[in-house]
């Protein structure tokens, strides 16, 4: 039975007296128990308006259902079928205007915390999951992508799924574009962005 609480499970954060002395991430993320509790707030509605608000068409009800059941690796598999950067998107996408902005639960309360759940799943995979083994038949063609910002990485990932051997060329010292150079550490840790780029299995 869905959890009909009108409010989201609160996001744990650093104490203000601690975070005013460092540049570490302010929001510390859900525990497994918190994520499962929040996931039960999804009523798996028939029309799935949350998906119409997602620019990359992540199967949101499907991955949330797996989180509620404690199947975190299956949830990761579902998310990454459409989105190669869930840890990053779970932190910096404007969910309040996209998926969460369309959530039915938001009509009489707070929407399901889709972004926080996506972040939890990605962080869980980074901590516990095995490195992905892609069984994709190569088509023998090579593609170069210029620029390793979010658009370049996404393009490369989609091409790789279709069997292309993709190499990204980047002029700067670090890959990621705005992910590495434009977002402050307390919002998106540089080490996390680098780790997610590594998991994307794209040559840069």
Name each model feature, range by range.
Residues 1-142:
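Ferredoxin-type iron-sulfur electron-transfer modules and their immediate structural context
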Residues 77, 194-198:
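Solvent-exposed alpha-helical segments within well-ordered globular domains of core cellular machineries
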Residues 84, 149-151, 174:
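Residue-level detector of alpha-helix initiation sites
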Residues 143-165:
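N-terminal Rossmann-like FAD-binding beta1-loop-alpha1 element of flavoenzymes
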Residues 164-175:
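Glycine-rich FAD pyrophosphate-binding loop
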Residues 174-192:
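Conserved N-terminal glycine-rich FAD pyrophosphate-binding loop of Rossmann-like flavoproteins
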Residues 202-204:
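Conserved small/polar residues in nucleotide/adenosyl-binding loops
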């Amino acid at each position: 039975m869905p959890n009909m609480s009108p409010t989201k499970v609160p996001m744990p954060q650093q104490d203000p007296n601690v975070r005013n002395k460092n540049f570490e991430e302010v929001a510390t993320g859900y525990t497994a128990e918190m994520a499962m509790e929040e996931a039960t707030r999804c009523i798996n509605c028939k029309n799935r308006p949350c998906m119409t608000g997602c620019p990359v068409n992540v199967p949101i009800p499907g991955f949330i259902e797996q989180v509620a059941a404690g199947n975190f690796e299956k949830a990761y598999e579902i998310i990454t079928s459409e989105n190669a950067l869930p840890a990053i998107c779970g932190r910096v996408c404007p969910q309040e205007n996209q998926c969460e902005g369309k959530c039915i639960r938001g009509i009489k309360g707070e929407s399901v915390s889709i972004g926080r759940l996506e972040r939890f799943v990605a962080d869980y995979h980074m901590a516990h999951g095995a490195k992905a083994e892609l069984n994709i038949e190569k088509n023998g063609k090579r593609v170069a992508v210029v620029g390793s910002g979010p658009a370049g990485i996404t393009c490369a990932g989609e091409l790789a799924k279709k069997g292309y051997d993709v190499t990204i060329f980047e002029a700067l010292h670090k890959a990621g574009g705005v992910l590495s150079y434009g977002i402050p550490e307390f919002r998106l840790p540089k080490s996390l962005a680098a780790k997610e780029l590594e998991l994307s299995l794209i040559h840069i």
